[in-house]
Swiss-Prot record:
Pfam families: Ribosomal_L12, Ribosomal_L12_N. Transmembrane segments: none annotated. The lineage of its organism: Bacteria, Pseudomonadati, Pseudomonadota, Gammaproteobacteria, Pasteurellales. This is Large ribosomal subunit protein bL12. GO terms for cellular component: cytosolic large ribosomal subunit. The gene is rplL. Keywords: Ribonucleoprotein, Ribosomal protein.
Length: 120
């Protein structure tokens, strides 16, 4: 006689918690698996996703604001006044949603000019 999935579910639903724990333990031993392993594997898969878009944030202009303003103008295409206002309003986001190599190149350019930069 073969039981349907629904009959199995009904039989499990009628059991007490301690009986279900015993059933799970018996199934783990019979099939050589662990119920906890499947649950633990799910968060690991989500954590494995690598970030692909980055934001470049000017944390501090540093001592050489003129060089930083020039670097910001070159990187963003802003006018002199807009770039100056952006640098003076640090911390400020310079570029959003760019690739990692582009973000790292921009960070290096701005740090060479004397700024403190973060990639988020």
């Amino acid at each position: 006689m073969s039981l349907t999935n629904e009959q199995i579910i009904e039989a499990i639903a009628s059991k007490s918690v301690s009986e279900i724990v015993e059933l799970i333990t018996a199934m783990e031993e019979k099939f050589g698996v662990s119920a906890a392993a499947a649950v633990a594997a799910a968060p690991a898969a989500a954590a494995a996703e690598e970030k692909t878009e980055f934001d470049v944030v000017l944390a501090n202009a540093g001592a050489n604001k003129v060089a930083v303003i020039k670097a910001v103008r070159g990187a963003t295409g802003l006018g002199l006044k807009e770039a100056k206002d952006l640098v003076e309003s640090a911390p400020a986001t310079l570029k959003e949603g760019i690739s990692k190599p582009e973000a790292e190149a921009l960070k290096k350019e701005l740090e060479d000019a004397g700024a403190q930069v973060e990639i988020k």
